[in-house]
């Protein structure tokens, strides 16, 4: 059975079905920050060391496979779907995954709404950029609830998957104007944190997995996505996550983009805090400012392409 083909002109492998024999994964990054992205948007991110500086969780032996990752959910009047099919597994009217050199693009369409999820790791920055472009291909206005979702790893991937007696009490986050800072152990013994942001105003958010997915729910059908909104939860221990919610209306033929970023920030020991108990966000704010517009993201994509032109 054929699952895809090479596009020689664009130097991409094009996957035509989400139901590949196993997840087909692209490896993004060439310096310090890396992301593994499958053909359905599964995977994880890390800084330098995949065990000791893991930003997001991934369960290798999970059933179903490849449920953890860089997730976008679209709730269109109660129909919930993902641009890359997983984890909701709602049948799409069309699907394509393009694995390129340093980037992956997931394209899905459902009931006249087209969604493209573009992921890459830019040169010179410790972050993953994830741009979502939505298009209303119908003749009527459409109102959507759109969600982003990642599940944070508590840094040491081995400890994170085994030392539950300790881990259930260490998770810590901070949210400022919709920007989610994962700062587990930052006060005690670490000088680094993760930041998960969007360049658009957030309607609601969640940082507790139980609040977003539901205690008896999961990534296939999160309770917040079904409800059409998050609950602005703040995680204290247990399983911290990052979830943004946007309530959008698209006019006929209109396109809108939202730029998400997942970054790693490390501060010198003497600069950990900007005030007592307040983490120093200066480097995070500078990073977010570098990817605030489509023009900036396009420029970062071009710079990445130029760096790989001789490969």
Predicted regions and their residues:
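Anionic coordination/interaction segments
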Residues: 1-308
